[in-house]
Amino acid sequence: MRTTIHKVITMMKGLIIVLKHAFQTPVTLRYPEEKRILPARSRGRHYLTKWNDGLERCVGCELCAIVCPAQAIYVKPAANEPGHIHSHGERYASDFQINMLRCIFCGYCEEACPTGAIVLSNQYELSAYTREDMIYTKDRLTEKTPGESGRDPSREI
């Protein structure tokens, strides 16, 4: 008799919990149609920005590659030639790659950059069909439209 009463009470407790949660709004989103609004400081896709005059901000100092804990960044610096200037510094990044498969989105590269060349946006849809497509080259990282990265690309340092 005692175990039967205990079983009924336990079932009633479980039923009460189920009924409580049955009428709450769901926390899931229908992803492709509805996208989650991310916090302002969330970190996603990387961008390389340019100055207002069109020159690259990256001076090829390699600080982003040095500070990256995942070693996901490769920078090959080259000297600016007098007739063919790429950046305001003495050097520029002739080759700049980020392996997005290795990146942990820590933001250290953004903090270490002395010119603010590399910024992390809040775009999180980074899927690709091949591993090679996940290695972002300089052309893919260069910001095409101002403000796409979530930061003001015209800010002067």
UniProtKB/Swiss-Prot annotation:
Catalytic activity reported: a quinone + NADH + 5 H(+)(in) = a quinol + NAD(+) + 4 H(+)(out)
UniProt cross-references to PROSITE patterns, sorted A to Z: 4FE4S_FER_1, 4FE4S_FER_2
GO cellular component, one term: plasma membrane
UniProt keywords, alphabetically: 4Fe-4S, Cell inner membrane, Cell membrane, Iron, Iron-sulfur, Membrane, Metal-binding, NAD, Quinone, Repeat, Translocase, Ubiquinone
BP GO terms, sorted: aerobic respiration
Membrane spanning stretches: none
Cofactor note (record): Binds 2 [4Fe-4S] clusters per subunit.
Location, primary (coarse class): membrane
Cofactor field: [4Fe-4S] cluster
Membrane topology: Peripheral membrane protein
Binding site for [4Fe-4S] cluster 1: 58, 61, 64, 113
SUPFAM superfamilies to which the protein is assigned, alphabetical: 4Fe-4S ferredoxins
InterPro entries from the UniProt entry: 4Fe4S_Fe-S-bd, 4Fe4S_Fe_S_CS, NADH_quinone_OxRdtase_chainI
Coiled coil: none
One Pfam family in the UniProt entry: Fer4_7
Keyword Oxidoreductase: no
Signal sequence residues: none
Location within or outside the cell: Cell inner membrane
GO MF terms held by the record: 4 iron, 4 sulfur cluster binding; iron ion binding; NADH:ubiquinone reductase (non-electrogenic) activity; quinone binding
Sequence positions that bind [4Fe-4S] cluster 2: 68, 103, 106, 109
UniProt-listed Enzyme Commission number(s): 7.1.1.-
Recorded superkingdom: Bacteria
Function: NDH-1 shuttles electrons from NADH, via FMN and iron-sulfur (Fe-S) centers, to quinones in the respiratory chain. The immediate electron acceptor for the enzyme in this species is believed to be ubiquinone. Couples the redox reaction to proton translocation (for every two electrons transferred, four hydrogen ions are translocated across the cytoplasmic membrane), and thus conserves the redox energy in a proton gradient.
Record-stated family: Belongs to the complex I 23 kDa subunit family.
Subunit structure: NDH-1 is composed of 14 different subunits. Subunits NuoA, H, J, K, L, M, N constitute the membrane sector of the complex.
Protein name (database record): NADH-quinone oxidoreductase subunit I
Taxonomic lineage from the root: Bacteria, Pseudomonadati, Chlamydiota, Chlamydiia, Parachlamydiales
Primary gene name: nuoI
